[in-house]
């Protein structure tokens, strides 16, 4: 049986309507503030959307220029052409025209590789260092860049700084796939520094990290030779 509605309940104001009335009264008395806040919110949305579209277009153009440089370099390599400053300039143009882009970051990495191949290890170190300023921690290229800097210092016979670079690679947060290579690099530097104990320690770490049977045999031979 349905509950009988009392006269008091009928005459009682509708609570929802009362809330609407209060909201309407607030809006009427605070129009200027509401318009200001709404305008700011809309402006923020427009700016955010505009910035997002701008960055998308910016990155797309940068990537296009980077792709041209990369494809040109690959074609030259297939044709047996030697590296030259023109190849490096193409990547340099990406950095100059689109600083802060992902393509510019990768251009530093490619330039590091190219300078090393050309024998300009100081320029190679500078390029890799710029790359490391931008690359995220999760990227395996970070480990490769640290190792590459280590090779540069090793080529300069600066063993302490080479060791530091290889240790930076070993301490990076990613790059488990390059762990064995990094340990071998550290071990080799310790061996060159005549620190046999540390060399053995890291050759053993490299051995424990490798899944390649031929590399495993090679490392065992080195370890037995040092012992």
Name what the model sees in each region.
Residues 97-104, 118, 133-142, 169-179, ...:
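Short solvent-exposed coil/turn linkers within tandem alpha-helical repeat scaffolds
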Residues 2-40:
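N-terminal positive-inside, membrane-proximal cytosolic segments immediately preceding the first
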């Amino acid at each position: 049986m349905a509950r009988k509605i009392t006269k008091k309940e009928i005459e009682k104001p509708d609570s929802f309507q009362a809330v609407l009335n209060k909201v309407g009264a607030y809006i009427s008395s605070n129009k200027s503030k509401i318009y200001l806040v709404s305008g700011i919110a809309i402006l923020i949305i427009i700016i955010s959307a505009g910035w997002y579209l701008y960055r998308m277009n910016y990155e797309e153009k940068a990537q296009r220029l980077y792709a041209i440089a990369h494809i040109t370099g690959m074609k030259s390599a297939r044709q047996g052409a030697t590296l030259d400053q023109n190849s490096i300039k193409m990547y340099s143009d990406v950095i100059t025209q689109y600083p802060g882009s992902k393509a510019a970051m990768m251009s530093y990495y490619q330039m590091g590789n190219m300078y090393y191949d050309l024998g300009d290890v100081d320029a190679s170190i500078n390029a890799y260092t710029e790359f490391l300023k931008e690359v995220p921690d999760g990227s395996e290229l970070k480990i490769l860049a640290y190792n590459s800097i280590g090779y540069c210092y090793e080529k300069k016979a600066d063993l302490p700084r080479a060791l530091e670079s290889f240790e930076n690679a070993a301490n990076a947060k990613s790059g488990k796939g390059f762990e064995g290579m990094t340990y071998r690099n550290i071990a080799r530097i310790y061996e060159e520094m005549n620190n046999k104990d540390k060399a053995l320690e890291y050759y053993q770490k490299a051995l424990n990290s490798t899944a390649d049977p031929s590399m495993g045999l090679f490392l065992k031979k080195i370890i037995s030779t040092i012992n």
